Amino acid sequence: MTAKTPLHTTHLACGAKMVDFHGWDMPLHYGSQLNEHHAVRNDAGMFDVSHMTIVDILGAGGRQFLRKLLTNDVDQITHNGKALYSCMCNEHGGIIDDLIVYQRASDNYRVVLNSATRQNDVAWIRAKSEGFAVGLQERRELSMLAVQGPNAIAKTLSILAPAHVDAVSTLTPFECVDVDHWFFARTGYTGEDGLEIIVPNEFVTQLWNDLLNAGVTPCGLGARDTLRLEAGMLLYGQDMDETTTPLESGLTWTVKWEPEDRGFIGMGALVSQKQQGIKRKMVGLTLLDKGIMRHGQKVIIEGCPDGIITSGSYSPTLQQSIALARVPVETGEQVLVDIRGKLIPAKVGKPRFIKQGKPV
């Protein structure tokens, strides 16, 4: 049976085209994916991301546990109200999921996980928590909205209660705050500034309608995908999975090697891979002729094994096709992409195309 978020009837009332997304009935768009994309780049858009998995890790052993569970080190969080992006790996260094962890208190951490990996992630975290002074609480009674774009925070502040305004207006990127059972984080998945807001299910429809009346554009999964691709943000299950490591996914920066005795899960395998050198790397591709790059297409590199496009689409901002691809480390500045049997040249660059709405 397909799952529905508390906003399901609201999406239908807004004219959403609904699609199945890993067992959830979610909006693909509300009439124009292109307009929704541009709204986020130039103004403000909102996404229902209540399908995401919210897990609170409670107890005195929370920090110690997360230092073992994650490749990034939560010891970098120096005070409550800070957030950290990380991979969660298996013993072989394969990526089980990528996530954001928020420190709400010294004994209270919140992690937001991908919906497609909900069962496996929760089971993994629960199994690995044995022996630590922690308890896990999956928060299915909460909904989550992402409000993104250069005007997202200003428009959100215009509809919030005074106590919320005071708390949210001082947030800097990758900070969070709790106010009256509402949780605000200055994080997102679009490459733009904005907020992710977690509220009890019974409040989310009013929040959505208030944002709509403030001029925030409803946006679906289609725009979310092109926005994150332009920003070089990876999609779990496409750009990385348990067969790939952070080092070959452009995520080495999320692995903290020191101190050596931290011994996070997968550390031995990743240290070995680092010492031996990776054979594949993540790059960005820009198509130099007509066509659209898509997931699964071959990347032809002279004198090397083929690479593979992990994510590809048309970029509404750049008005050309862009892609993320995993290729041999020897890959040079130009490759060929096999698009329906035609070999189309593409320029190789960094796996990021847009920063704060501007070409990189």
From Swiss-Prot:
GO terms for cellular component: cytosol; glycine cleavage complex. Keywords: Aminotransferase, Transferase. One of its GO terms (molecular function) is aminomethyltransferase activity. It catalyses: N(6)-[(R)-S(8)-aminomethyldihydrolipoyl]-L-lysyl-[protein] + (6S)-5,6,7,8-tetrahydrofolate = N(6)-[(R)-dihydrolipoyl]-L-lysyl-[protein] + (6R)-5,10-methylene-5,6,7,8-tetrahydrofolate + NH4(+). Its EC number is 2.1.2.10. The keyword Transferase applies. The keyword NAD does not apply. One of its GO terms (biological process) is glycine decarboxylation via glycine cleavage system. InterPro entries: GCS_T, GCS_T_bac, GCST_C, GCV_T_N, GcvT/YgfZ/DmdA, GcvT/YgfZ_C, TrmE/GcvT_dom1. Gene3D superfamilies: Aminomethyltransferase beta-barrel domains, Aminomethyltransferase fragment, Probable tRNA modification gtpase trme, domain 1. The glycine cleavage system is composed of four proteins: P, T, L and H. Belongs to the GcvT family. The glycine cleavage system catalyzes the degradation of glycine. This is Aminomethyltransferase. It comes from Legionella pneumophila (strain Lens).
